[in-house]
Amino acid sequence: MKILPTLAEVKKLASDAKYNVLPVSYEMLSDFTTPIETMKILKNVSTHCYMLESAQANETWGRYTFLGFNPKMEITCMDGKMKIGNLKVKTENPSGYLRQILADYKSPRFDYLPSFTGGLVGYFSYDYLGYSEPSVKCIVEDTENFKDVDLMLFDKVIAFDNLRQKIILIVNMPLDDVEVEYNKAVMELKQLAELLKNGEKKKDPGGRLLGEVTPLFDKVQFCDMVEKAKHHIREGDIFQIVLSNRLSAPFEGSLLNTYRVLRTINPSPYMFYFSGTDVEVAGASPETLVKLFLASAHMPTAAARETLLQAVHH
């Protein structure tokens, strides 16, 4: 079992004070499973998991599919009440706490590993704008009760390399007691490989609608919004606006199979499946908006404005 980096290399890197964690990895062939089948295994051992992937413009799959489960910590905030693991604080600046957390997880980059080797996965709601731009008053009725932010800290990553037909298993180890933590990481990699090969899959309950799909606004209300938007455009108040009308329906089951179909019929640059404490999300979008890579932000030259998103509260 070839583990990278070696213990000797880790000891050398640990002497650099700017790092406090380090990704230890193991490669295996991927011909015995698929990302969806792997997700079924992960859902059998953890209710908290995610899948991130992309399809390129020529409809071939992007290079990496990332999966994670069993987060080390969950971080949420709603109405200024922030929960970091078991710690509860009241704050008007949750971003400050997030920066403090990320400061404790600085790791070196390795050319043989994908760009994402662990970190925070989750969502920021539109209401989060109130923390970063308090001058922007957006007073709307909260009909869904989503958290302002819900993030999970994943220190283990399963990366499908779709170009090389390999699976890269990654475990992030702290650098306070190098030899002990390295051996622990190696053991976790072995357990993770065994889980992927022989783990029991959670039976997919499927999903079905229990009632009619209804819009948030009826036709008269929506047309009134359109007329107001046209007025503000003519007045020069705005130059672009996206009017949306959420469709909702009672639902039972899981969105995993929905995501499985979605990634097939609508392969997109930005596709995601996320399962948390009280929400499950499956989505596909033609826009990645911003990708941060090696301290450089990359933005698409053109981005569409439509996003297909399905979410279920549990």
Predicted regions, residues:
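Extended alpha-helical targeting/anchoring segments
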Residues: 1-314
